[in-house]
Design a protein with these regions (language model features):
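Phosphate/nucleotide-binding beta-alpha loop and adjacent structural elements of enzyme active sites
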Residues: 1-220
């Protein structure tokens, strides 16, 4: 989702000198988008990747050890709307774990969603973007990507006024719930529009059928 009337802001970004653009990747399991890793961005960007799995953060840190110091920062934290304690629902595929319980009917009846089958529940500490940014003296969240299995909207709410510094948000949404109590597209869209953003496009549309595989709905 891209912010309305951001031409002036984009022009200002082009003119930045000696100031880093902060790329926030929440749910960074498996690594960062290649478009950001390019060495031409090493001197103008800082990437902050969040994942609740400390082992995964350690793996990512090792895999990017040859990048300049401070360019990629792996943060082993779970984000939510407010700091505190939350349950983390660990699923068969760790990348499908969520702050919300997976819907059992789906993993039982849709083969492509067996990955969301619940394995265990643990209690974890969570924080929010505003608190984390303040404690790390970060003033802007220039680009935000969120893929956190249903908790995306509350993470955005936890950014508070820092959303005013954001130019673009790449966020996973669902039209039908995969997790109990999760936010859906219409709620996320309404929240972002109320904060000055407008929808740019929907990509990677997927339909989960009762067959073995998910169905990609994107046009060529």
């Amino acid at each position: 989702m891209k912010k309305k009337q951001n031409d002036d802001k984009l022009e200002n970004i082009k003119q930045l000198e000696n100031q880093f653009l902060n790329i926030i990747d929440i749910g960074c399991r498996w690594g960062f988008a290649e478009r950001f890793i390019n060495e031409k961005y090493h001197s103008i960007m800082k990437i902050y990747g969040f994942d609740a799995d400390k082992l995964e953060c350690g793996r990512l840190k090792e895999s990017y050890k040859n990048t300049p110091e401070g360019f990629i920062n792996c943060v082993p934290l779970a984000l939510a709307e407010s700091p505190g304690k939350r349950n983390l629902y660990i699923t068969k595929e760790p990348g499908c774990s969520s702050l919300y319980p997976p819907i059992k009917y789906l993993s039982d009846n849709f083969p492509a969603l067996k990955c969301t089958a619940l394995e265990k529940v643990i209690s974890i500490d969570v924080t929010n973007l505003a608190t984390w940014a303040k404690s790390n003296d970060i003033k802007t969240l220039d680009y935000i990507k969120i893929d956190t299995q249903g908790s995306e909207l509350e993470i955005l709410r936890g950014a508070g006024s820092l959303l005013e510094t954001t130019v673009c948000i790449d966020i996973e949404v669902e039209f039908n719930p995969l997790y109990e109590g999760q936010s859906l597209f219409w709620e996320t869209d309404a929240f972002l529009r109320s904060n000055g953003f407008s929808l740019w496009r929907l990509s990677n549309l997927v339909h989960y059928s009762s067959e073995e595989k998910s169905i990609e709905l994107n046009e060529p």
